[in-house]
């Protein structure tokens, strides 16, 4: 059979399952892919293929994740499922797999459990835009009133973490929907879930539609032409003769892009994902350095003080062997550069041990271009000891 061409007509979206251990996340993931394989002819992955997820390394942190894909009437979904709780925590904090929407799986016989809450808190902190709840194993609860009570508890929990009270809740049994002889009644919950995902999750803003930003990696002088900076465009589009700002480390400076090159060819414009060289008007080589960014004027500002949520690598992952305390001074790695800074721990936290996840307040010796959601690594002697993202900007 000839290979099928990737269909770009449907909107692409990243989703994932979250929730307490053994509440049925992987079973639900398998039920969705099975349903879609039958309906749309997608490739099928069986439950055990999803559950023994391969290890991935994201900046030296080992994370087990399984990437699935399926399509609905409206979208093409890339879906991540993590087998272990620690994998979820690492995945969400390090932003290894960004989610445009999450499916929170709650077992009806067990209701809300500690990891249900922890995953919701993380989803809120790392900016997962919206959540749909799948209330699983409802066939194991005889009393419909009990199911209603669980639903109420789920809604209260959602609002306590800042998600809307009218978040959709789909009830069903992933296990029943997954069975060989599943009836239309058994799979109705999966059909309803997909329809709700299509309607309730909003289309993600594509990187190319966001304001232009390029982290500077290298700087060259071209005799008779001026200064060229190189890097990969993180977001947005840059056109010839557009004004940009050089942000971070030094005072912000305006300039104009007078040339765009990729693979030694001249372009009229560069877009998110392109590795480009940009010629800057009236800028000397010594005025620019690695670690600064080029950005659309006014779209990003330099900051030194921020809150972040981080995961601290365990000793086995190559992290520290001992805890650290408030006042710890490591290197913070943002985009393309290391900058020295101080880590302060929140009130009530005396120290942070390898393997922990925690909130910190970071303060840098130089300002860098920063916005909420920016990924960071904390390094010591050239090795990564923690990883996470900026959750709030202080100054």
Curated annotation (Swiss-Prot):
PROSITE patterns named among the record's database cross-references: G_TR_1, G_TR_2
Chain segments carrying region G5: 173-175
Catalytic activity: GTP + H2O = GDP + phosphate + H(+)
Signal peptide (UniProt feature, chain positions): none
InterPro entries according to UniProt: EF-Tu_GTP-bd, EF-Tu_GTPase, EFTu-like_2, EFTU_2, G_TR_CS, P-loop_NTPase, Small_GTP-bd, T_Tr_GTP-bd_dom
Residues at which GTP binds: 19-26, 81-85, 136-139
Listed EC numbers: 3.6.5.3
Family from the record: Belongs to the TRAFAC class translation factor GTPase superfamily. Classic translation factor GTPase family. EF-Tu/EF-1A subfamily.
Description of how the protein assembles with itself and partners: Monomer.
Protein name: Elongation factor Tu
Taxonomic source organism: Treponema denticola (strain ATCC 35405 / DSM 14222 / CIP 103919 / JCM 8153 / KCTC 15104)
Lineage per the UniProt record: Bacteria, Pseudomonadati, Spirochaetota, Spirochaetia, Spirochaetales
Name of the gene encoding the protein in the UniProt record: tuf
């Amino acid at each position: 059979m000839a290979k099928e061409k990737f269909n770009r007509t449907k909107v692409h979206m990243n989703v994932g399952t979250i929730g307490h251990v053994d509440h049925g996340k992987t079973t639900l993931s398998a039920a969705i892919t099975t349903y879609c394989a039958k309906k749309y002819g997608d490739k099928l992955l069986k439950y055990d293929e999803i559950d023994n997820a391969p290890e991935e390394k994201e900046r030296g942190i080992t994370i087990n994740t399984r990437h699935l894909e399926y399509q609905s009437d409206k979208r093409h979904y890339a879906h991540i499922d993590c087998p272990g709780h620690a994998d979820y925590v690492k995945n969400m904090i390090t932003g290894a797999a960004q989610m445009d929407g999450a499916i929170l799986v709650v077992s009806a016989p067990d209701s809300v459990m500690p990891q249900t809450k922890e995953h919701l808190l993380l989803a809120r902190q790392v900016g997962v835009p919206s959540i749909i709840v799948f209330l699983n194993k409802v066939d194991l609860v005889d009393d419909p009133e009990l199911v209603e009570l669980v639903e109420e508890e789920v809604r209260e929990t959602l609002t306590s973490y800042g998600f809307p009270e009218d978040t959709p809740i789909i009830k069903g049994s992933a296990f029943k929907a997954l069975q060989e002889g599943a009836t239309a009644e058994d799979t109705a919950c999966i059909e309803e879930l997909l329809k709700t995902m299509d309607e309730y999750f909003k289309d993600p803003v594509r990187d190319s539609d966001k304001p232009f930003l390029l982290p500077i990696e290298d700087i060259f002088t071209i005799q008779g032409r001026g200064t060229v900076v190189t890097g990969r465009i993180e977001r947005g589009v840059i056109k010839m003769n557009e004004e940009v700002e050089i942000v971070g480390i030094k005072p912000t400076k305006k300039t104009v892009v007078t040339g765009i090159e990729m693979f030694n060819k001249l372009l009229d414009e560069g877009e998110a994902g392109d590795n480009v060289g940009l010629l800057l008007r009236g800028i000397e080589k010594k005025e620019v350095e690695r670690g600064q960014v080029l950005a659309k004027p006014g779209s990003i500002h330099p900051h030194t003080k921020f809150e972040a949520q981080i995961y601290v690598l365990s000793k086995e992952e190559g992290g520290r062997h001992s805890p650290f305390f408030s006042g710890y001074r490591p290197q913070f790695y943002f985009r393309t550069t290391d900058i020295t800074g101080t880590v302060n721990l929140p009130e009530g936290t005396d120290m942070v041990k390898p393997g922990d996840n925690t909130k910190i307040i970071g303060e840098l010796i130089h300002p860098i271009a920063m916005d909420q959601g920016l990924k960071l690594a904390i390094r010591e002697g050239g090795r990564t000891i923690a990883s996470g993202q900026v959750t709030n900007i202080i100054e």
